[in-house]
Amino acid sequence: MIPQFKVFMPKTVDDELLRVLHSGFIGQGEKVNQFEKDLGDYFGNKNVLTINSGTGALQLALRLANVTFGDEVISTPMTCTATNMPILAAGAKIVWCDVDPVTGLADPDSIESKITKKTKAIMLVHFGGIPCDIEKVNKIAKKHNIKVIEDGAHAFGSSY
């Protein structure tokens, strides 16, 4: 197989990487616990849980929002398929909203126009370091008693 790209790994991480690999705690343990604490400090929120992937995190968020077969989730087509696949995996229907032609982000007015009795959640994607209009979307969601799920993989550390 020809690799599409080679991951760069500086020699300075070798010792620490080997220490983690040989600890037996690859998916959980001291380093993950410390990372979650540091991340919580960074965000000012102690309730941090790391997941193996962004897709896994979105699957969990959809479960917590009680999204199931026959429900609708408003999302954007301007994203990686990994954002929308968990919606289908939950048995729900993806309802795409329009995107703002300047930012490429979900248009809050379009989101509101797509809401039906079956709408259970809004899946926002903060993209390219630009956060969506959270304030407006949260206002819409509250008005219609709909959960908001945010995919921030492309805007980590951005502020609104």
Where are the predicted features?
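Conserved coil-to-alpha-helix start sites within the AMP-binding
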Residues: M78-N84
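Phosphate-binding glycine-rich loop
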Residues: F25-E72, P86-A89, W96-D98
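Solvent-exposed, non-membrane alpha-helical residues enriched in polar/charged side chains
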Residues: L18, H22, E36-G40, Q59, ...
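N-terminal "arm"/small-domain region of PLP-dependent enzymes with the aminotransferase-like
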Residues: M1-F25, E30
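Conserved donor-binding loops in enzymes that form glycosidic bonds
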Residues: K6-V7, D98, F127
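Generic structural signal for small/hydrophobic residues in well-ordered secondary structure
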Residues: L17, L39, A57, V73, ...
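Active-site phosphate-binding strand-loop segment of PLP-dependent enzymes
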Residues: V102-Y160
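Glycine-/small-residue-rich active-site loops that bind phosphorylated ligands and cofactors
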Residues: M9, G27, T79, V102-T103, ...
